[in-house]
Amino acid sequence: ILHTGAGKDLNAAKQPVVFEKNGQKVALIGATRVIPEAGWAATNGHPGMLSSYEVSVEPLLQQIASCHADGEKVVVLIHWGIERDEKPQEYQRALAKRYIDAGADLVIGSHPHVLQGIEYYKGKPIFYSLGNFVFGSSIPKTMLVQAAFTGESLSLQLIPGTSSGGYTRMLTDAESKTQFYQYLEGISFGVSVGEDGIVSPQP
């Protein structure tokens, strides 16, 4: 199983997983800003996770910049935030902007177990939390995001769902989808979600 965000040492932990399709390379880089014990973080000569705390974020930023310089589209997968809190912390918003300034094209967060909003920065989208894909507890709202890079453009479409009893189910009826999109717009930052789930910045 391909993985990113952890390894036998810091160099291994920061390595991306790179996919190529139709001549376009996409680099996925995983990291965390939630580490229960300091010893879980990867360092030179010590296995662990790629840390994204403010005092340890430089290796991640350097890896983002390196992938960007190689012509790859960069997706940062970041574990952060407060569990069950639908509002992103200010540090999440600040870190996401640092990732984008370093060259990231898309930021996708996890850990809160609930939806958090979407924001654009310099034309690049930030998904602060998608909710749960598969988890033991139940949450009424969760989602997937389909992201497609075409040249310099990125299209985004949401797949809304609900999760309970360890199962995630897609929403299928139009009314439930509309309510979901309206809710997500309400917790986001200057973002529009169309009836078809297409995400775009508000003009």
Q: What does each model-identified segment do?
A:
Residues 1-203:
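Acidic, metal/ion-coordinating pockets
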